[in-house]
């Protein structure tokens, strides 16, 4: 029930290596410059004085990053506290460059749309749920998968030609901006289904390291 971005990541095992698609349940992020990431993390961490997260530290940093406003509207809307892991979307956030053996490339975004719909809790609902079950997100996912109610997400891609980059009134490569679907259409390419729990928790969960830099030829 914590109001916070929730991760959404997948590991693809291919014949040419492993590709980690690391993202969030929101289509954008707080910052657009990677060099700001350490400062962002420091602001989010507990205060070194009392070891408690300090909202002043968080918003002192974010107030200096006006492009974070888009992300904040997601976090402080109902999507900031999803009703369940099943009822949230997933996004790769960044625009990836996909290229062929001729060196030709397109920019692509990966969007996972929940087939269960997207639902969130308001402040009152979140407080009530936390009082009943602090682990309700995990419990909900576990119970539904074990009951055979497998959650599914349709995978859509958005494809942009490099020659079109300058035809927008914003930078399409800025991760704090979305690609409106009326400007860059989504195309369905598959469906993700969670059809079982990990059989070996240590091997399949604790040892899984997801790194944005893990790419494969063509991406």
Label each region the model flagged.
Residues 1-219:
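Active-site-adjacent core segments of small-molecule enzymes
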């Amino acid at each position: 029930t914590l109001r916070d971005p929730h991760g959404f990541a997948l590991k693809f095992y291919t014949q040419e290596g492993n590709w980690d698609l690391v993202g969030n349940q929101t289509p954008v992020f707080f910052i657009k410059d990677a060099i700001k990431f350490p400062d962002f993390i420091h602001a989010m961490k507990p205060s070194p004085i009392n070891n408690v997260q300090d909202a002043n530290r968080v918003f002192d940093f974010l107030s200096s990053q006006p492009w974070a406003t888009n992300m904040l509207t997601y976090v402080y809307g109902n999507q900031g506290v999803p009703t369940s892991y099943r009822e949230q979307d997933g996004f790769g956030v960044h625009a990836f460059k996909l290229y062929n053996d001729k060196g030709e490339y397109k920019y692509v975004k990966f969007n996972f749309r929940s087939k269960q719909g997207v639902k969130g809790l308001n402040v009152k609902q979140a407080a009530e749920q936390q009082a009943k079950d602090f682990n309700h997100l995990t419990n909900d996912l576990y119970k539904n998968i074990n009951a055979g109610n497998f959650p599914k997400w349709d995978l859509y891609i958005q494809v942009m030609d490099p020659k079109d980059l300058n035809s927008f009134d914003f930078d399409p490569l800025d991760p704090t901006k979305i690609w409106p679907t009326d400007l860059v259409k989504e195309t369905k390419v598959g469906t993700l289904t969670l059809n079982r729990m990990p059989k070996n928790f240590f091997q399949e969960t604790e040892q899984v390291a997801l790194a944005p830099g893990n790419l494969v030829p063509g991406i």
